[in-house]
Design a protein with these regions (language model features):
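A short, hydrophobic C-terminal helix/tail in secreted or cell-surface proteins
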Residues: 462-481
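N-terminal signal peptide c-region/cleavage motif recognized by signal peptidases
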Residues: 16-18
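Sequence/structural signature of beta-propeller domains
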Residues: 21-458
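Bacterial N-terminal signal peptides that target proteins for export
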Residues: 1-7
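C-terminal membrane-anchoring or membrane-association module
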Residues: 477-492
Length: 492
């Protein structure tokens, strides 16, 4: 077990809020220079505790969180071993505030033979862009009831089952229309447009993964539209993102649905001085996470590519979108056999999932005076609260605070924070005084009792209710004792 110092930032907000409110509570930061528990080497490419906010899962039985890394600090150019970080957060059950962060385990993801998967893209790892091999860029995580994991990946895009030790058990069958292919039909897991003409966009595969309440269906969501499904045959111009349903028992896909991203027109109204272009719609705006609710609805986390991160260490570009939405598949058209190529408009008779605003993260953080991170990617409901509400935990992917050139030369990104200064130093070097590596940030929100009930969470008696219930039992017991005593007296 390893404990880390963290920066605790409490908001001025309290939980004395109206029913159906969601309140930002506080944040903590895990140092960008912290190390994990892997024993395969030291340094940013081996054991730096970073990037583990690509997705987040909470297990109420063990009160632990599971964070997933992506392909590593090299952007597909470094042989990094993707992993799952198991950690604990001290969550105040009265307020929802998060405290100390404790790393409990680091699980390397390995193939069936025990060899670690690699973040290297297939061309570098296998010498062939058409051979996926052990290349893995994890982005979505599910923990099954037996302790196994389902992991979604961007390269394939793939869904893979691992046992509790991180060893591969099986790979689900990816629908053919999602696999990136060249004009001759050859798969290409590395290239982008115009080299690929069908399938997922490069680096825009399965970004989120979740499991239905009954454990039978897994839902994987692409980050953005397919490469050719948009006006002018360009997915970057479209809002239509595919959600894929998988039968967990067989590993086969059963349906595909359309989730529509927020319109850039609406987002541009929020950031009129730094607008998104037509080809930013389905490229710079996308889905980061998906979470199933007990009643069959899902929560989708959607964001733009702006905010404090390795590409903007001082958060100078205004953020347009960081929001969560509740969606419903009921009534949505199964588009598994429907092509949307060449158009951003849905065909007549095709209905997308319905979508309702749930949480404007951007607005909450601005109101709290907090710099908005670029990659808020993990979302999980945490412990229930004493008032019958529930905590909601969000986590960032800090990209290991590393940037690199196209040739693979890496540098640590140091910053003094939003509006400050930044510098790049040699990997593992020392940041200039007043600067530090970009931290992983974990945010806590509190949902009221009514909000929790509206999402399908079971009712939990509030402390006052428990007190009245216990008092009632006490009075009943007292009355019974008085009655028994009276009966004994009469009998005597």
């Amino acid at each position: 077990m390893r404990h880390f110092r963290f920066l605790l930032a409490l908001s001025a907000a309290t939980l004395a809020t109206p029913a159906s409110a969601i309140t930002f509570v506080n944040q903590i930061s895990v140092s960008g220079s912290a190390t994990d528990l892997a024993t395969i080497g030291s340094g940013a490419n081996f054991n730096r505790l970073g990037g583990f906010g690509s997705d987040l899962v909470y297990d109420s039985a063990t009160n632990q969180f599971f964070g997933l890394t992506d392909r590593g600090p090299g952007g597909g150019l470094i042989d990094y071993a993707p992993r799952i970080q198991t950690f604990a957060l001290n969550v105040n059950r009265s307020t929802g505030a998060i405290g100390s962060f404790t790393l409990n385990a680091t699980t390397i993801l390995r193939d069936g033979g025990g060899t670690a998967f690699s973040g290297l893209n297939p061309a570098f790892l296998n010498g062939n862009a058409a051979n996926l091999g052990r290349s893995l860029d994890p982005e979505g995580l599910v923990r099954l009831s037996n302790g196994h994991y389902l992991v979604s990946d961007e390269y394939g895009p793939s869904v893979i089952e691992f046992d509790a030790s991180g060893r591969q058990i099986r790979t689900f069958t990816t629908p053919a229309n999602l696999i990136a292919r060249r004009a001759n039909g050859t798969p290409d897991y590395v290239a982008g447009r115009p080299d690929i003409v069908t399938g997922r966009q490069d680096n825009r595969g399965f970004e989120g993964l979740t499991l239905s309440a009954d454990g039978r269906t897994a839902y994987a969501v692409l980050q953005d539209p397919l490469v050719n499904e948009g006006d002018q045959g360009d997915g970057r111009r479209s809002r239509n993102v595919r959600i894929v349903a998988f039968d967990v028992a067989s590993g086969q896909s059963t349906a595909q649905y359309i989730y529509q991203l927020e319109s850039r027109t609406v987002i541009n109204a929020v950031v009129p001085t730094a607008t998104f272009s037509a080809t930013n719609q389905g490229r710079s705006i996308g889905v980061s996470s998906i979470h199933a609710l007990s009643d069959g609805r899902l929560i989708v986390l959607e964001r733009d590519n702006r905010g404090l991160g390795v590409d903007d260490p001082n958060a100078r570009t205004p953020v347009g979108l960081k929001s969560a939405f509740v969606i419903n598949l009921a009534g949505a058209t199964n588009v598994a056999n429907i092509s949307l190529a060449g158009s951003s408009a849905l065909p007549s008779g095709v209905a997308p999932v319905t979508k309702t605003a749930f949480l404007d993260i951007r607005a909450k953080l601005i109101a709290a005076g907090i710099a908005i991170p670029e990659k808020i990617e993990g979302l999980a409901f945490g412990p229930r609260l004493a008032n019958g509400g529930i905590s909601l935990i969000l986590i960032t992917d800090n990209d290991y605070s590393v940037t690199q050139t196209g040739a693979g030369a890496q540098f640590d990104v140091c910053t003094s924070g939003a509006g400050g200064i930044t510098s790049q130093v040699a990997l593992g070097g020392t940041c200039t005084a007043g600067q530090s590596l970009i931290d992983t940030r974990i945010f806590s929100f509190a949902l009221s009792r009514d909000e929790a009930l509206s999402l399908g969470f079971a009712a939990v008696p509030e402390p006052a209710s428990w007190a009245m219930l216990i008092a009632g039992f006490g009075l009943t017991g007292f009355a019974m004792r008085r009655r028994n005593k009276a009966l004994r007296t009469v009998a005597a």
